[in-house]
Amino acid sequence: MGLYRPPAVALMADVTPKPLRSQGNAVINLMGAFGGLYTLIMMKVAVTTDAAGNANYTALFASVAGLMVTAIAILVLTIREKKLVAEMKAINYGVNEDEDQGKTETVNGKEKLPKPVLKSLLLILTTIGLWFLGYNAVTTFFTSYATATWSGGLSHASTCLMVATVAAVASYIPIGMISAKIGRRNMIRIGLLTAAAGFAVATFCAREFSFYLYIVFAVVGFAQASVTVNTFPMVWEISRSGNVGKYTGFYYTVSMTAQTVTPFLVGIFLDKLGNDALFPYGLVFVLLALIPISLAKHGDNRPEAPKSKLEAFDVDD
């Protein structure tokens, strides 16, 4: 999957004008959600059990593999990358060479990002790391928290997480459109503040289950969509044609490292302070993420939007 996912995601950025990449990333997230839904459905219908009670997952794995092969076949047969890149450069969405945030400078014979742009890239990556440290800690340990704290906690926890997922999926496309209007950085800050509010409410009110927690997790789902739809395109904005894949690798390195480290870190806090430390832990890291994203001066899109949603793709054959 490490060889499959980053190039597939980078391909979208390669063929999409920079100001439209938030919308493009929203579509990617939406399709990822559909893929997850497909797998959940197949887990229900494709897993069989023999007389001894042993589960057979062959059909499940075959169905998922078949979907991936089908997707690759469609990609190979329908996507003409060079043609699409040429069309994208022809459109260029009003971004001239002087405005290109991925423009490099030559130092000692090597191409490097200007220091202000490099600083912004590091700040954006720091934001991504802090976000995943906070958000993934809560989503990873929430089921354990609910099971230990509430009566019937597992069922309630599963529903809360499902509500968050549905809210995120429903928000992807609208958030992509809103981001084109108000800018990616502003949308990320809105998402971080919204997540912080949700975690703050849960800190004081989640010791007993109540249906209002579904609202809290719907808010958190919206926040997750706001951040993930826009942080990736901010990294891409600093890239240039030909090195989008490298910057995609930067994003995945930081995000996956944070997701790997945070269960260990939050586990230490929960062991020392108890389950009630879960939401404050997430709250602290989400609030910290507001600092670097507010300091980043590059990576935002130009908020001017086309008169028609399809205008940017209206090119002559």
Predicted segments, located by residue:
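Juxtamembrane intracellular "pre-TM" segments in multi-pass secondary transporters
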Residues: K83-T126, K309-D317
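Glycine-rich segments within core transmembrane alpha-helices of 12-TM secondary carriers
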Residues: S22-K44, Y252-T262
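C-terminal ends and interior cores of transmembrane alpha-helices
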Residues: L193-R207
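Intracellular juxtamembrane helix-capping segments at the cytosolic ends
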Residues: L3-T16, S226-R240
